[in-house]
Amino acid sequence: ELVRTVNALPNQPFVLALDIPSGLDGRTGLAMPEAIRASATVSFAAAKPGLVLPHAHAWTGALHVRAIGIPLAAQRKAPCSFYALDGRSLEPLGHILPDGFKNSYGHVLVLGGAPGLGGAAHLAARAALRAGAGLVTAAAPGAGMADIKNSWPEIMTLPLGATERRWPAALPAELVELLERCAALVVGPGMGRGADAADFIEALLRQPHRPPTVFDADALVLLAGRQDLLDRIAEHDVLTPHPGEAAALLGCSAAEIQADRQESLARLCGLCRGVVVLKGAASLVGQAQSPTLLCPYDVPQLAVGGSGDVLAGCTGGLLARMLPAVMQSHHAAQQNSTAATDISQPVRLQPAHTLAGQAVALHALAGKSLADIWPLRGNTPSDVADALPRTLSAYAAAPAQAAPRIHTRDRKDDILPWPR
């Protein structure tokens, strides 16, 4: 009754919520069934994940997190289970090799773009380049190559049969040779869902020494119900389902996925050893036995067909460019068990988990940057891809450069720590 009375006052008073607005679910960010509409919320040590979800802003108002002196030993014993994907998470991506050349930044192979669906593969390849990959090749049945290249000379192509419209059941020798030279794969954008595509994915997953792979779009649907293939997903692979594709993988409806996204992510992570990105407003990134990364943004400029293909390509680009360095850092951290010093450094994520989270943050912030030009949407996914390097330079300045200028409202400072 008190909550309803305060919320209904004609002249709204300043309401300060401590820890969490009364009546708000700290996990989901939903009222149960009513919650106080705070002008500001001060949470302690680290915010509850529900507080940073976009729909919770109506109840939290301005969100602040402040330290209250929790002992370091206690922080280490009870590390955070959620971490925010904001501008700070991009800072490690600012390192540029002064003596680097194209091979230093990795070769991405995009497998997708069946005839009539080449635009999806083009967007993935374009995004991989914009994310900093040194080389990008797209391979697909030969009849669809022109749409994939789309007048971009930077995208190399490998036609799988000069006039073929179907995916080969066995991997051609030239493709196997290319796999051995690539640092990352992106599989699925515009691939199609026919039996030929299913056979091709099975052959790919049975290929030894397969590079780290991003599975997206049609590839995810073709993996649904194939636990024998999901068992071949490695810890450095990434799955990027939207709610519909997640529903196919779990054998339920998209509405059930959306009803409890955190539980849905946990179930998806239980299907395989890889990293899972559950896309949507406030995307979640998880891996079995690891913390969850939460992207606290709702970006209308990303609500356009092809945006997911851009994310897949961006993820592949970061895997190709950064995975060796991140793996080296991860190994060094494992040798130093005392590296975690406070609540912001309790856990070292697996390298692909870290990079997938950074790709999600980069993609979201690139979309947000387009609001200045297209505040009411109307942008294309190509615009999102082309905004990636500009966004990266704004948030991940190299050490020799000036510190990036980041607005607090974009960073969501101090909400949830980012693991170093």
Which role does the model predict for each range below?
Residues 38-40, 51-214, 221-238, 243-420:
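Small-residue (G/A/S/T)-rich helix-start motifs and N-terminal tracts that mark the onset
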Residues 15-24, 185-188, 214-216:
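Short acidic catalytic loops
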Residues 1-79:
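Internal gly/pro-rich beta-alpha loop/helix module
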